[in-house]
Amino acid sequence: MAVTDVDGDGDLEVLVAGYNGPNLVLKYDRNKKRLVNIAVDDRSSPYYALRDRQGHAIGVTACDIDGDGREEIYFLNTNNAFSGRATYADKLFKFRGGRFEDLLGDEVNEQRDVANRMAGRSVACVDRQGTGRYGIYIANYASGNVGPHALIEMDEAASDPSRGVIALTNVAEQAGVSKLTGGRGLVVGPIISQSRSDIFCDNEYGANFLFRSNGDGTFTDVAAQAGVEDPTQHGRGVALADFNRDGKTDIVYGNWNGPHRLFLQLSTNRRQRFKDIATQKLSMPSPVRTVLVADFDNDGELEVFFNNIAYRGPSANRLFRVSRREHGDPQIEELNVGEATEPDGRGTGAIVTDLDGDGRLELLISHGESAAQPISVFRVNPGTSNRWLRVIPRTRFGAFARGAKVIAYTKRSGPHSRIIDSGSGYLCEMEPVAHFGLGKDVATSVEVFWPDGRSVARRLELGDMNSVLEINYPTEEQEATAAAEIECGNGFIVNENGRCTDRDECTQFPPVCPRDRPVCINTYGGYKCRANKRCGQGFEPNDEGTACVAQVAYFGGTRSSGRGLGTQAPRLCVAVLGLAALQLP
């Protein structure tokens, strides 16, 4: 499933990939409070082509590939193939001449033989050049030397968008991502880059890839150095988040019947590395499909949802809250997922979006593969009084800025960051919105960073809470922000460019640390003090400075130990909306 504005009316619709039936476009009818399929079986409908009844679609994504301000829609088909070559090509639909048409079926693209005819899995969008025009990254499932990963973009020199001519080309080899593997999960965003889009692929029967952007449209795989190769496991759903609110992007993903991972990003000698902090409960193996991250109850802390498929027996979905802790790894607690447990569900995908505009996220789960089942729609009851903020950045062309990073600074809880989804979960793409739950806190300013490095900051007032903000791509004049206009919250100051930056309390005079713990260590948004204890090579003082402990040495291989929680987690009541029993044509 994927979320985008299909009909151009400003509201978001849900695309559903149909494997043994037509693709669907589900629009929320606010009067009837139900989802309605607008891709009807009527050739006069502008959405008729999207149905693509012949395709066995399993993945879908949407983004603006030609810079017209409207997102194109890519369906990944796997007809008659688990791996290698399929018998039916993927489809890339553009709204042209009042209706959706397949660009890959255009004569110019048939001559170029650019259509992907491989058995792929996930698809995602990446703006590798920072132009606001996206390419479609396809995680193909190779068979021997057949079926490398692909990256399809518009060939600007051969195209004439004003006349509807969009010539496509596969630039995977040029970009450095043409790899052969059992491609599975895929996610895009500024993972280890400041604002440029990196690509993480979790794979089956092979090591994961972490493609770092080189800033020139090419990528380098740094998974081994970063410690996220996980070569003996079989990845599925994956998502990005900043769980401990330290300004770095973390990675959470599920392995098929293997230990699930929550990789927290570290900074060791200015090198990006990750450590797995998954607790025993979170890492518990399951037949996992989609993994997504959201703040369902708007309390300011993130939840991780694992959607499982009933494979050789029941397998319930699971939900975990990951809460920031001062000077420590986040606390992870399992929640009661309520009616969304679905132990007999044949889960194949899941997305989050705000269907009814009330500021609370709905969870949609698709099913299929081994048995036909309806789509489920859930909402969370707790948190109705919590504040929230939704931010929608736009590209220079006015489309959704997939891959942009949004940071909301608050009065009490520090900065919260989100990445506008470019394709994630597993075979899915979330809504193009940065959704912030604030609890009782207030956001004071928001910053947006686009994949080309441009940014903008905006001061927020109390009246901006519980609202949706659209932020356009900035001109040079708009990019400059007066420092006096911005409020960053505790632990941060405004720099000369009008952006919030960490305050280094350790340089203050008089010193902030007491005499018995004189060593000051600056942290993101704060500091910590410890005793002046020296340690030998390979060891470092603990947080209190009272003992020497081994330095973090897990950078891949076996799972690091996690701290289990023995307390009973609070119940998170998930109730089915009135539209759970969908009547779809």
Question: Model segments located where?
Answer:
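Beta-propeller blade termini
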Residues: 1-8, 56-70, 119-135, 183-193, ...
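Acidic/hydrophobic-patterned starts of short beta strands in beta-sheet-rich repeat architectures
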Residues: 8-18, 67-77, 130-139, 193-202, ...
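Solenoidal tandem-repeat scaffolds enriched in leucines and small polar residues
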Residues: 82-84, 97-212, 217-224, 230-240
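Gly/Ser/Thr/Pro-enriched helix-cap/hinge segments flanking short amphipathic alpha-helices
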Residues: 136, 158-159, 164-166, 272-284, ...
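C-terminal GPI-anchoring signal of eukaryotic secretory precursors
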Residues: 552-571
